């Protein structure tokens, strides 16, 4: 399998990217290099090799959840630049 310039142009259009001719040419070469590497990996003999989802034997290295007292609402809000009732007030980010 190989990537053509037409493929790169199509993917760029889908991703709303614009490439110069030089960038598109370089991207084509780089994607073909990546695909060649993946094909090489596919040729490896992995018979008898167990699949891994994680290279570490550790299961859960996080601390246990322990309920403990927290600061009061007033303490949490005392340095807030803007608040409304018992809540932090922040700028609207979604229209």
Swiss-Prot record:
The keyword ATP-binding applies. HAMAP family: GatC. Keywords: ATP-binding, Ligase, Nucleotide-binding, Protein biosynthesis. PANTHER family: GLUTAMYL-TRNA(GLN) AMIDOTRANSFERASE SUBUNIT C, MITOCHONDRIAL (PTHR15004:SF0). Belongs to the GatC family. It catalyses: L-glutamyl-tRNA(Gln) + L-glutamine + ATP + H2O = L-glutaminyl-tRNA(Gln) + L-glutamate + ADP + phosphate + H(+); L-aspartyl-tRNA(Asn) + L-glutamine + ATP + H2O = L-asparaginyl-tRNA(Asn) + L-glutamate + ADP + phosphate + 2 H(+). Allows the formation of correctly charged Asn-tRNA(Asn) or Gln-tRNA(Gln) through the transamidation of misacylated Asp-tRNA(Asn) or Glu-tRNA(Gln) in organisms which lack either or both of asparaginyl-tRNA or glutaminyl-tRNA synthetases. The reaction takes place in the presence of glutamine and ATP through an activated phospho-Asp-tRNA(Asn) or phospho-Glu-tRNA(Gln). It holds the Pfam family GatC. Heterotrimer of A, B and C subunits. Its EC number is 6.3.5.-. It comes from the Bacteria. InterPro entries: Asp/Glu-ADT_sf_sub_c (IPR036113), GatC (IPR003837). GO terms for molecular function: asparaginyl-tRNA synthase (glutamine-hydrolyzing) activity; ATP binding; glutaminyl-tRNA synthase (glutamine-hydrolyzing) activity. It comes from Chlorobium luteolum (strain DSM 273 / BCRC 81028 / 2530) (Pelodictyon luteolum). GO terms for biological process: glutaminyl-tRNAGln biosynthesis via transamidation; regulation of translational fidelity; translation. This is Aspartyl/glutamyl-tRNA(Asn/Gln) amidotransferase subunit C. It is an enzyme of class 6 (ligase).
């Amino acid at each position: 399998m190989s990537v053509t310039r037409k493929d790169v142009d199509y993917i760029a259009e889908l991703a709303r990217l614009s490439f110069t001719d030089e960038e598109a040419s370089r991207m084509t070469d780089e994607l073909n290099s990546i695909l060649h590497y993946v094909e090489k990996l596919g040729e490896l003999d992995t018979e008898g090799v167990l699949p891994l989802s994680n290279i570490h034997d550790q299961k859960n290295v996080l601390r246990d959840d322990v309920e403990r007292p927290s600061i009061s609402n007033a303490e949490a809000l005392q340095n807030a630049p803007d608040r409304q009732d018992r809540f932090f007030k922040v700028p609207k980010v979604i229209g």
